[in-house]
Amino acid sequence: MHRGIPKSSKTQTHTQQDRPPQPSTELEETRTSRARHSTTSAQRSTHYDPRTSDRPVSYTMNRTRSRKQTSHRLKNIPVHGNHEATIQHIPESVSKGARSQIERRQPNAINSGSHCTWLVLWCLGMASLFLCSKAQIHWDNLSTIGIIGTDNVHYKIMTRPSHQYLVIKLIPNASLIENCTKAELGEYEKLLNSVLEPINQALTLMTKNVKPLQSLGSGRRQRRFAGVVLAGVALGVATAAQITAGIALHQSNLNAQAIQSLRTSLEQSNKAIEEIREATQETVIAVQGVQDYVNNELVPAMQHMSCELVGQRLGLRLLRYYTELLSIFGPSLRDPISAEISIQALIYALGGEIHKILEKLGYSGSDMIAILESRGIKTKITHVDLPGKFIILSISYPTLSEVKGVIVHRLEAVSYNIGSQEWYTTVPRYIATNGYLISNFDESSCVFVSESAICSQNSLYPMSPLLQQCIRGDTSSCARTLVSGTMGNKFILSKGNIVANCASILCKCYSTSTIINQSPDKLLTFIASDTCPLVEIDGATIQVGGRQYPDMVYEGKVALGPAISLDRLDVGTNLGNALKKLDDAKVLIDSSNQILETVRRSSFNFGSLLSVPILSCTALALLLLIYCCKRRYQQTLKQHTKVDPAFKPDLTGTSKSYVRSL
């Protein structure tokens, strides 16, 4: 059995010669493999195999290890009479071993994959933290030059508003007490006519001159482009807002039948608030100003009061209501088409029923307070009905949409002293951040409430790269300007600390009655409780908290930006000085060009004059050299010795061949 093992292992290694080697790290296994290699080398030398003769020793050692592993596996296999049966069990055992190795490698692969996943997530987290840190405003560096963040709010935009119509009946239905109040109602109608007729005339003029645009063709394509046209000749002078509002008025007055049915309903109604649903499924709220007073006060008192007293009470009530109408619709008398009425003024016309109106309109939620504070609800007069004495208002109430991730920051600048000059850093009053991006923020169309900035349009616009570097902490990129007069903040309270320019205002410690001095080399003074718990500054006594800012900021440690001018007069003066200096520089450049041209010409003439004697001297030197060389050659020829033809040399002792050659 032992002799058959090498044969089987040899057969196995021939079939598995393409399997990659499996190196081992154990010392004993290496020694055993070397011994096995030494014992089997003689057998392999007797059987020459061309496939293994040229292979390296490492391959042979790996084959030896595979034989050893196979021999260990064969020890657990029962002995069979037939040797071929033994060989048939070898691939099965090997496959089991391979499966066991794969099963052992699978959890390792899973662990390595999880490690790679965590590594990638960690890298992404660090990258996001790096970007966020780069994107954040560097408040510490900005505080050294007097820039302090005072507030940050969310950014919301008013989207396209929803429109709804509100009908206000200006005269109550007093049919039950008509006999006692006929005179008072007549006088009140005259007052209403003096208010409503100018508005009605302006609305009628605009709506009559806005007509449907008739299509020139009869085809479907031409009819699709039909709209409205404005008769500009009849209007005379009209602003863009009036023209736009006039077209809206025309569109709201197209359904005259609905207005007629509304008039009939209001004449028969005694309810103060009534919801009338028209065919267009638009909710119209009808409000009668003094109807509740008539129904709840005057009608029940008819049995206890005289008819004259009832009329007087109704007259006083109507006169008060008329005064309120004048205060509300006064701007509409001057511009009845494009004038807007705020919700705060409209509450008087609604008789104090603002909560019921909001409930009828279905407007509720956390944004209602913000809209009321921002005066987002607007109304316009769209129709005046003189016979029925009612007006129709178009209410537009917006929907707020918060822009996720955008934070609006408010910046305040505190002045600082450099020697005897007082400076302050010029930065925008509001900026916005969104991740890595920093942008300018135009607050002209925005209203700031407790936690939000509500804007009627997009207020974000790009910021210059230089200003972005300033906001991110590069103080050398922050421009500064001189303080003119009393402009600029001398101190500010931030994080419980006082950031003050004690060189320009008096800073006093109220607790110890000592003056807080600021040395000339300091820019600002940061006062906390460790310096003085109770500070008197600029006439105000402030109790400060723990230290949140550095004790002092020295001028030498801060890189200050360039100096600029913001005042119009200063800008104009500086611009004029710059232009004057440019003109002077141009004159100097022209004069320098003339001097250079003169020097160039003079240098050319001097060079030409200097070249003549140099060439003459060179020619004379060459001639002199030639003459000297010729004379030297002649002297050499004269000194040469001449041979006498009669001279015969002594040839004694010379060979005959040499003599013959001579």
Swiss-Prot record:
Query: GO cellular component terms?
Result: host cell plasma membrane; membrane; viral envelope; virion membrane
Q: Where is this site: Cleavage?
A: R224, F225
Glycosylated residues, per the record, are: N141, N173, N179
Entry keywords, A to Z: Cleavage on pair of basic residues, Coiled coil, Disulfide bond, Fusion of virus membrane with host cell membrane, Fusion of virus membrane with host membrane, Glycoprotein, Host cell membrane, Host membrane, Membrane, Signal, Transmembrane, Transmembrane helix, Viral envelope protein, Viral penetration into host cytoplasm, Virion, Virus entry into host cell
Q: How does it sit in the membrane?
A: Single-pass type I membrane protein; Single-pass membrane protein
Q: Which residues lie on this side of the membrane: Cytoplasmic?
A: 630-662
Stretches with biased composition (Polar residues): 8-19
Which superkingdom heads the taxonomic lineage of this protein's source? Answer: Viruses
Q: Where in the cell is it found?
A: Virion membrane; Host cell membrane
Biological process annotations from GO: fusion of virus membrane with host plasma membrane; symbiont entry into host cell
Region annotated Fusion peptide, chain positions: 225-249
| Cystines in this chain | C446-C455, C470-C478, C502-C507, C509-C532
Kindly provide the PTM information from the record.
Answer: The inactive precursor F0 is glycosylated and proteolytically cleaved into F1 and F2 to be functionally active. The cleavage is mediated by cellular proteases during the transport and maturation of the polypeptide.
* Extracellular side, ranges: 136-608
Q: In this record, what's one Pfam family?
A: Fusion_gly
> Which residues are the signal sequence here?
1-135
Spell out the residue ranges making up region: Disordered.
1-73
Its transmembrane ranges are 609-629
Q: Which InterPro entries match?
A: Fusion_F0_Paramyxovir
Bias (Basic residues): 64-73
Q: State if Glycoprotein is listed as a keyword.
A: yes
Q: What family is this?
A: Belongs to the paramyxoviruses fusion glycoprotein family.
Q: What is this protein's function per UniProt?
A: Class I viral fusion protein. Under the current model, the protein has at least 3 conformational states: pre-fusion native state, pre-hairpin intermediate state, and post-fusion hairpin state. During viral and plasma cell membrane fusion, the heptad repeat (HR) regions assume a trimer-of-hairpins structure, positioning the fusion peptide in close proximity to the C-terminal region of the ectodomain. The formation of this structure appears to drive apposition and subsequent fusion of viral and plasma cell membranes.
Please give the subunit comment from the record: Homotrimer of disulfide-linked F1-F2.
Write the protein's name: Fusion glycoprotein F0
Q: Which organism is it from?
A: Canine distemper virus (strain Onderstepoort) (CDV)
